[in-house]
Amino acid sequence: MSTGDRRVCLLTGAGGTLGDAFCRAYAASYDIVAVCRRRAPGVPSQHEWFVDPLDPDAAIPDNEARVFVVYADLEKQGEVERVVDIALARFDDVDLLVNNAAYTFLHPQGVVDGDVVLDSVERHFAVNVAIPLRLATRLAQRSWLHRDLRNRERNRNVVNVSSLSASRVYPGGQAVYASSKAALNHLTRHLAAEFGEFGVRVNALAPNTFPSIVSTETVADAIVRLDAESVTGRVLVVDADAAAEAAS
């Protein structure tokens, strides 16, 4: 069960830069299922329990703000379903799905530099498009479908972490990565139309490079902003000259 009135968040890529920042900033606000491939976020999890040796019965704040870590390789068959089942078994429901896990392979020499770029296409689209689709679909099938009123009451939604490169051309060999994120943006719009039928919103977040151009904390805050709003089918841009602006 969730803790009190806190929302339940299923977060992928929890051990990365953004996932870690989100857990650090919002572990006290959300019950977070932190999905990691290898490295867990740097916050207390169900694997730790803190005790004051001078007062063993004292309440320790870190014990109330723990994340529930799940190690999974979402590229392997059946792992998405396992993660969804674990999240629902632990908390009964999920209010917010954050598809943050991503694959990035840049090719500064261009797409014609041998076969290395072509060989990366399948994995880019598998991780950046197919896995978010599968997670959202399985969660809808196993929890959200036919629960329109409850979904609207809880303002349930999906946030897909995309990239500003999905709509702009940057140097550095981002052609395949950017194309996969552009596909994620359009997938977001289609899912918003379909999931709206049972009261679930779907949006995407398109940050510039973090933390070098935009602070990671700003991007994490933008996820929470989308969670709190009522908008659906939109891409929220997070750039240095505009902390968060809507983009169609």
Q: Where do the PLM segments sit?
A:
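Conserved glycine-rich cofactor-binding loop
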Residues: 15
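Hydrophobic positions on the long internal alpha-helix
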Residues: 83, 98, 135-139, 143, ...
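Conserved glycine-rich Rossmann-like NAD(P)H-binding loop of the short-chain dehydrogenase/reductase
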Residues: 29-52
